[in-house]
Amino acid sequence: MKRFLASGFGVGLVWQNIFGNKKGGGTLAPLIFTVLVYFLNLNVLVLSILFVSLLLIYFYSVEDHYADEDPSWITLDEIVGMSLVSLASPSEMLPLIAGFLVFRASDILKQPKFVSQLEDYPGKLGVLNDDLGAGLLGLLSATIVHQVSLLTL
């Protein structure tokens, strides 16, 4: 059960088993989450509760011995990071897309530098921290896009 949860509710495991590729699950899992958030039209309160719940599930499900190596099938950390982004404007497509792109670029490239420095914490906290940092950048980007879109109405 813990492995299923840590894999982003199976997404990381399915991706790896079907495609035989260890790369890509970290993008697919938050993308699925983003599409669900948009189509379920969840409000910010529900998303805030979901964010905290996902954090708790992460700390429950990711074993410290997995976190030391950060296996690619663990994708719940990316979902947690993207859940931060979704708080900006969950029912608007453009802010979600902008936030997703900034989140993934920051997470993959480990830029700006503070995102990579957040990984220096030991164990599962280090694995999660870079996604939270990238999520904050995505949240900022999504918020800016949302605010600019309000000005153009």
Question: What annotation goes with each model-predicted range?
Answer:
Residues 1-68, 79-153:
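Hydrophobic alpha-helical transmembrane segments
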